[in-house]
Structure formats: structure tokens, C-alpha cells
Amino acid sequence: MAACRAQPPTSEQAWLEAAQTFIQETLCPAGKEVDKELTRSVIACVKETWLSQGENQDLTLPFSYSFVSVQSLKTHQRLPCCSHLSWSQSAYQAWTRGGRPGDGVLPREQLILLGTLVDLLGDSEQECRSGSLYVRDNTGTLDCELIDLDLSWLGHLFLFPSWSYLPSAKRNSLGEGHLELWGTPVPVFPLTVSPGPLIPIPVLYPEKASHLLRYRKKSSIKEINLAGKLVHLSALIITQNKRYFIMTLGELAQAGSQVSIIVQIPAQMVWHRVLRPGRAYVLTKLQVTKTRIHLSCIWTTIPSSTLKPLRPGYVQELELDLEFSKADLKPPPQPTSSKDSRGQEGLVRASKVLHYLGTVTAVLHESAGLYILDGQLILCLAYQKIHGLRRVIRPGVCLELRDVHLLQAVGGATTKPVLALCLHGTVRLQGFSCLKPLTLPSSKVYGASLYEQLVWKCQLGLPLYLWAAKTLEDLIYKLCPHVLRCHQFLKQPSPGKPSLGLQLLAPSWDVLIPPGSPMRHAYSEILEEPHNCPLQKYTPLQTPYSFPTMLALAEEGQHRAWATFDPKAMLPLPEASHLTSCQLNRHLAWSWVCLPSCVFQPAQVLLGVLVASSRKGCLELRDLRGSLPCIPLTESSQPLIDPNLVGCLVRVEKFQLVVEREVRSSFPSWEEMGMARFIQKKQARVYVQFYLADALILPVPRPTFGSEPSQTASSCPEGPHLGQSRLFLLSHKEALMKRNFCLLPGDSSQPAKPTLSFHVSGTWLCGTQRKEGSGWSPPESLAVESKDQKVFLIFLGSSVRWFPFLYPNQVYRLVASGPSQTPVFETEGSAGTSRRPLELADCGSCLTVQEEWTLELGSSQDIPNVLEVPRTLPESSLAQLLGDNSPDSLVSFSAEILSRILCEPPLALRRMKPGNAGAIKTGVKLTVALEMDDCEYPPHLDIYIEDPQLPPQIGLLPGARVHFSQLEKRISRSNIVYCCFRSSTSVQVLSFPPETKASAPLPHIYLAELLQGDRPPFQATTSCHIVYVLSLQILWVCAHCTSICPQGKCSRRDPSCPSQRAVSQANIRLLVEDGTAEATVICRNHLVARALGLSPSEWSSILEHARGPGRVALQFTGLGGQTESASKTHEPLTLLLRTLCTSPFVLRPVKLSFALERRPTDISPREPSRLQQFQCGELPLLTRVNPRLRLVCLSLQEPELPNPPQASAASS
């Protein structure tokens, strides 16, 4: 505070001279001579106040104190302080003990403050008075707060013995501090006491004034004086045009004896600080006026009206020359509330109205008007426009609340009861705080106008308002300050420019706000009986939704994914019990969980800034706590191709949170699947998928994250002021992967290592264009018009961020900023030319995209004489895919992913040195169903992703539709067509997996239909008859090495086989026919029991008997033929199985669901028909017979028996 005042003088004479100088400069009217009487009065007042301590009798003047002006406080005092001239040191210490331990108490400064107490900010009487109080001297005016005010104090010079000064809590705001005036100010000159009236004032009391108002037409009285006890005082109403308040005189117990007066004269707004409910007053010169809303009449003051305390002998009741009947004297009937509960009587609760006196213990949110009282109650002042008082409220302040609403269990993450004031109630300051103001974050200081709009324009009820305030605070925690500044997020809305905070909350308010909610009317809220306001009734709120951070959402997704990870549930027992250890662990190695947004309670809303990552080459939604990869799609199955959306704020309510789980396990067999110790490692990859139609995209008014500054340049609507650009049509994009690049000259010191990069090939559509204002100049003429304009672009380093936006058959604009005079896009034979000679053989130029270059979505319409670019995706024909004429060609197609499993890496990688084993990645096998317009039953195809340099691909999930471009087609040694990812491959997700997918039933066909047409169904159902059994085999094999296990012990006898487990495996081959054709069907494992007609317990018993020999095999030569058995034929189990296989229990009609053993991708030559002789009586018949179909059993059921005919009624 040293800067606020000079050092106090050391002698009495010097102190008096400094005081005289201060009084002359600060308190004397400008332009007048020295007022010695004023100087003597001020010093005498200071001396009297100083000596009132009782501890300073040895010093008659406060030499340690110095005078301070208003301007000095506003200019130099940057920290809160207090001064107590009349307090002793012990009194100050006792006062400071009122603060809680750890809280900062206001430091004491030795300052003397004098000034005139006024209710007018300026010097002109024409200025509007708002009811605020000020301390004024010659240097300026300062806002102040006073607990008790007497109207006679206004305009007089006072010494303020105890006060505190608090600068503004907002940064960079000078002169917005305020004074808190403790105790009663001491007048420098004695105040003149106004004598009572010479004759008593004729007055009406409330009961007769109320009757007169109702029957005013019967009386000629136009102006009255009113006396009575103040029973109710409304809040000070602040509108755009004026301020006013309403006071009610009368008796609380008698509703008909009350009368209301509206005070709306600006000079009388200060009355609101003086009036105290329970005291009696006299108001003079009242007239009748009509309210704007209800057009009802009410008494009102005029500029010459006065307010006086009611004292005995000052008034005399006025006798009216009116005669009232008994019916007239009855109070008017009270209207009943017409508020409709809309059928929710069981949910709607009523608040309680009460008076409360409490101490503020915490500030929840200053801008939202939320505080904590006595550590137990939430105080909400948002439903009153209280501006001046809010700056005073801090821990330690004592408040009196009258006619306040008590709401309990409001919900919306609020557990404490809430006290809320409507316009009918008042809040009055009862005591200041000795504590310094808390240093609040910007989120709780800015945005008062936004929170007012939530109440007054959006008409939010209290439960919803509390939730909205908490949600806005969470959003600031997510986005500020690196995404945008707090004051930008909470800025006051303007026409055409809604607040960003409101835009994020508003999309769901149509559901949350009840339809037909009435608008607030101040007159109705204050005057209507019974009382009706937004706080009168409320419905407890279930938290509608929340905005989790990206980190919290990813952690929640992983938690749910691993909580549902159950190996036994993933592999049901009938299937798992027959798998070897290798098969078992491979099935568990990869799985995924899709969590739609509807499964979260409360609902989760995705909110983040769209960022293109240069480290991963994918799109991310990012906030201050983390980021999540994302895949946005349009409704037309098109990806996001506009780079201008980078840096925008994305809000999504409907999305899919995908968690891919990878597990490294070593379960010996299915029996140990419940033991967690066999899981060595597990990891998850989390990302989100959503459609742009379900997203709200908002531009952010400033750059987003400083870690990747270059990517926000394209999102700037103005664009660079200087630069050049060129349009190109993209024809193909290669895979994003780590590639080797030659070192540039001078970089030999850096070791070469693979770099994440990708390449695109395309065609220049025109020459270079220069920046002209906000657009581009016409394209420059080409040096050689006939030259091929094909181009090869290399993206590496920071330019990898453009990978998610580049897709074939799209037009893009490559922009290079800066005043470069050299056309950078015409450069040929760049450093990348020698790196990829094969790819560049057909390209006229090669460019490495620089990190500072940006990408924009272009259009071929920008260039004249250029045909519209087709948007269809390249598709290979079915003949190209499944033909054997081009075994190593590149193919493109769209398909639906049916399954995805992890597979072993290629043999070349498995032969790597043990030291590099950590770098080996397992491959991925996708089984897809091709989408072909001319194919009724889409064939299935396997796709392998085995390149270790390829980063993990997101979005390749079962059920998703994907377009694969330039896969390498291969043919296996068994003539099966499959495809592999290569560096030239690119992937485009067309649609996400459906949240609920109903499996379509298999078609029911005749077997002969499988022999007709080129593309029969791969899977189907048929009704057939088992003719005979061809073979049956039951094995017990080692779960680790698959060797035969007689007596349950591995026959390999190799120390390298650690397994002590054996699993059973069985298969049976059947001959079936349905009258149109015959087929051999193989059934495996648990389906063997169904084929043999055995119950689970009977099948388990047979398996246990087969455990001893380890292998039981039966081979049947034909119908009626002998059995060829690898087992001993005299053994009981063999005899049982041989008898069973030839019995009618097996040879029966069944309903068979099957898959073709010959896959649609099998291009091996089909087996030709053969000649076969049949005996028909005595005549031999020779005919050509088609080869038997080979089927794999999927399920086997007993045929449905026809319903028996209804028995006819017996004749009488």
C-alpha cells in the first residue's frame, strides 16, 4: 500500500499541514478559497474517532495514519485491504479470528478515508439513479456497500472509521473496485434533524387504501398518503428501460388488509436500501397506475413523493366520504393456481417459502450466482438480477434471505438442499467478511450475461439451471485455455452470433424444457396470489447427459470392455472343448466391443476439436485431457474429405465407441479358461465412429493446439494473404506405412530408418494460381501444353496429417503460402525421383509435400473446359476376382467384413533372430462377403494383412462395409483365391457395423440347385435323408502338439511338449440325398453326437471310453458292405458304434444346415460327371451321374413333424 499514500509525518505540525493540504485538494469545492472551518471540523472528527478507542490517550492525533483519496485507492491499491481508525489492536485481532484457519484475512492499512455519500454516479442530477451508493470526493467516485442507510445521510460529508477496499476480481479492469463501509459513518458536520410536521399528515391505512383502489370511481381522491407496517419487499427489478420495486404495507395475518405500492422513480431507487420489513413507514403523494401485463391498478409514487418513518403523532387517519357495504369490505376471492402439472403429479414437488439468516462459507460459481451457506445449503441468486451485491458475497458474509424458496433433492448431480430467490423475495446484507476475496478461475468470473440468458431467455427451471452451470464448467475444463479463451466461450450472445456455450447445450433443450413453459412476468411473480414463480414447483432432474473428457471416455470404454471379457462366454463349451491350445488362444487373441452412445447412463456427448494427427495419420477428437481416434462418415457412405473442418469443434450425441481387445494367452485347454493367470498380456485400442449428420460442427475463433500449428491454417476462413496453389485430381492413394527414404545430401550423420509416409498419384488440372484478395487468380499457362500432367506426391513428416482427407476421384488444391516467385509445383525431378523409379515411371513430375503446405478441397468447376469428375469407386469384376487368368494382379472391390482373427506372421518373419522377436507383428485375417450387383449369393474371400510396417487399421470390424483398393490377388497351392495388403493398398470405410444385426435365415433349397448356375449359395438349409455312414473317427489328441494321447497321455514323449491335457476330436462322413441329388456331409465334434442321435451324456460316455485307446476309427465300404476298422473289431466300443451307424436311429430324415466344402474362391477344375451302371430288374442301365456334392455340416436338427389331423366330432 506504500504506493497508495505518502509516508506519515513524524511531527504533529507536519501531520496537520499534510491534512490541511489533503482537505483543500480533495474535499473543498473546486475554485474556492481555503475553508478553515472544514479543516477544523475534519481534524476534530478524526481526533474524536481516534480517541474513541480508549487506548490512545497519550496521542491525540493518529500520526501513523495518512489521508487517502478515492483516486489513490482506484489507481494504486491493487490488493484488498481494510482500515479501522476507531478500532484498537485487540479489537482488530478479535475481528480477524472470525476467519477460518488458512483463509487470508484482510490486511490492515493505516488510512483515513473521507467523502460524500451519494446515490448519483455523476454530477448532473439528470443522470439516472440506479439505487447504488457511492463515496465521492474531488478526485472521483467509488462504489460502496453499506449495511444500514439513513436517507438523511445522502449528500453529506462523512468520515468512514472502518472500511475495506476490494479491487476488481477481473484482470485488466482498472477503477472497478468497491468499498465496504463497516459500522456507522461519522458526519463531519452535525446532521440537521428534520422536525416533525406542524400538523399531522392525513393518511390512509392499508385496508382502506386497498378498498379505495378497488372502488376508486366512487371517490374523487386522486392522491393519498399511506401509512402502515412493511410486510413485504420485492427484489429490485432491473429491465432494459428502467428499475423498480414493489413494497406491501399491511398485516401478514390479513390478506385483505394489505396494499402494494410500486416505486419506479429513479431518485427513489435508494429507498430499497432503507426499507426494512417489520417497520412502519409513511409514503406521501401516491397515485394510481396500471400495470402493463394485467392492466390492474396499483398505487405508485411520483417524483415529489417522500418516505418517512412512522412515528406517533405524525399522522392522522383520513376519513373517506365513501360508504362501503359489508360485501365491499370482504377481501377479494383468491385465484387458484392454473399451472398444469401435465400429468406428472407424482413427480412434481412444491418448494417451501421461508426466511433464513446464514453465513456464506464457499463460492461455488460467482457468475452463475451459486454459493454455499453454512456449509450445508446451496444459495442460488440467478433468478434475481443482483449485480452490486454479488461482488460483496464471499466466505464470511452474513445474509438475510426473506421469502426464499427451499428446494430439496433437485437432482442433476446436486445433493444439497437449495435456497433460491425469485423476484418476490429479497436478500439483504447483514455483515461483511473479514476475509480477502478468493482468487477465482476465469470460468467463475466471466459469463454473467450468459447465465442470465439461461434463466431469463431460455427459461430454465432450477434443476436444469444447476445442471447447465455445472456442465458449462466441465466444458471449460475440457476446452480452455488452449482450445479457446474462457471469455470467448462465455461471451455475451449477440444477434446472429450465439454464445458457443449455448450452442453446445441448446440441441437437447427441446427435450429437457417442458413444452409451453410460461414466460416470467415480474408483476405476476410479485403480486399474484397464490404465489406462482419458476421456483414454486419443480421436478427432480435425472442428469440428462454429460461431456466426458476424451481420457475419461477411453478409460470408461476400456473398463467396460475388460469387464465383459469372459473367455468362456466368447467360446461356448461345445465348441471350445474340442479346440487345441493353439486354436483356443488364437480365437481369444482379438475381440472387439462396440458401445453405442445409448448404453451410457447418463448419456455421454462427445465433444472435442477435430485434429489431423501427423504421428498416426488419422483424425482425432482432442481436448485438454487427451485425444481419441475417430472415423466420421457422411450419410452417403462418403468419408470426410474437407480439410477445412480441421480445428472445428465437434459435438456428437449418437456415436459408437469401439474397443478392440488384443490378448496374449496360453490356456492349455478349455478347462482352464476361467483362470486369469494364463493371460500374459492384454491391450486395447479405443476409437469412435459417427456420422456427420449426427454431429454439430462449430468453428473455433482461434487456432487450436500449438503442438501442430500448421494444420490449422487450412481452417482459417480468410486464407493466406500471399501464396500460390494448384488443383489436382487424385487417382490413387497408397497405404500409410513406414518406408525407407534416401538421405538428402548433408544428412549422412543421421542413421536411416523407416519413416511414416504415403504416396498419391494424380493429374494436374491447371497451372499455378496466385492469391488475389480472398480468391485465386486465373491459372498460369503451362510451359509445354502437350506435356503429360501426371504427378506423384510424397507425404512424409508433418504432411502425413492430410492422409485421412485424400481419396480417389476427388479434386484438391495444394496451397503453398509465402511470397515465393518460383512456381514450386512445376519443379521436376525432386529428391524423391530416385527413390521410387518404378512408381514414377509414368509420372511427369514428383513432389515432396512440404510441412508448411496446406490442402484444401477443390472442385473441377473452378477450371473451365474440365469435365465433371466421376465419383464412383473403382470395382473389379467377379471374373477378375475369381478368375485364374491373372494370379498376381491388383484388384479393388467393396465387401462386408464377416469375421476377423489374428493369424501367425509369415514364415520369413518367424525366422528372424530371437533378438528381433519383439518387432514381429501377428497378421490379421479378414473374411469378407463381396458386394456384386450380378451375384445373388455373394462369395466369401479371405484378406490377409501381414506387412509389419503397416500401422493398425481402425474401422475394419465385422459387420462394416469397406472398399478395398488395389489389393494383391493371390492363388494358393490348393487353388484358393485370396488377397493381401500391399504398399499400394488403400481402405475406405463405407458404413459402420449395425448396432443390432438380425441374422438372416439361410435359404432352403434342394440339393440339385447346388449343381445349377455358376454361383450357388455358399450356405443353405435342406431337408434330406441319411442314406448311410461313410466313416467315423474319434480322437484324443494332445492340446499342445496334437499327437495321439492314449490313456490321456501324449504319445510324442518329447520334453518340448509341456502339455498335460488331451482334447477330444471327432468327425463323421455321411451320405445324404433328398430325391434330387446326393451329397457327402462331414460333421465334426459336437455335431457328431447330433448325427448319431445321442444325448450329451451318452456322447460324453462314448468319448470317455475312447480315451483309453486314444483313437477309434470306422470305415464303411458301402450300403450293406462290411466295416473296415482301424480299431479292434471285437472291442465293445467298436461293436457299439458299428451297430449304431447302421441302425435306423442314424439312418433317418434330418434337417441339415450346411456350407459348401468347395469354397466359392476355389478355382480348381470341377470334377466331371462319370458313367455309372444301375440294375433295374434284369436290365442294366448305364447313365452319366454328376459327382457327389461335398458339404460341411453347420447344424443338424430333427425334421418338423406335420400336425396331426383334427379328430372329427363324434356323431350324436
Swiss-Prot record:
Organism: Mus musculus
Subunit structure of this chain's protein: Component of the CST complex, composed of TEN1/C17orf106, CTC1/C17orf68 and STN1; in the complex interacts directly with STN1. Interacts with ACD and POT1.
One BP term from GO: hematopoietic stem cell proliferation
Nucleus in keyword set: yes
Keywords tagged on the record: Chromosome, DNA-binding, Nucleus, Telomere
Name listed for the protein in its UniProt record: CST complex subunit CTC1
Similarity-based family: Belongs to the CTC1 family.
Signal peptide: none
One Gene Ontology term of the molecular function aspect: G-rich strand telomeric DNA binding
TM segment ranges: none
The organism's place on the tree of life at top rank: Eukaryota
Compartments it resides in: Nucleus; Chromosome, Telomere
Main location: nucleus
Source lineage: Eukaryota, Metazoa, Chordata, Craniata, Vertebrata
Keyword Transmembrane assigned: no
Reported function: Component of the CST complex proposed to act as a specialized replication factor promoting DNA replication under conditions of replication stress or natural replication barriers such as the telomere duplex. The CST complex binds single-stranded DNA with high affinity in a sequence-independent manner, while isolated subunits bind DNA with low affinity by themselves. Initially the CST complex has been proposed to protect telomeres from DNA degradation. However, the CST complex has been shown to be involved in several aspects of telomere replication.
Any Pfam family hit: CTC1
A GO cellular component annotation in the UniProt record: CST complex
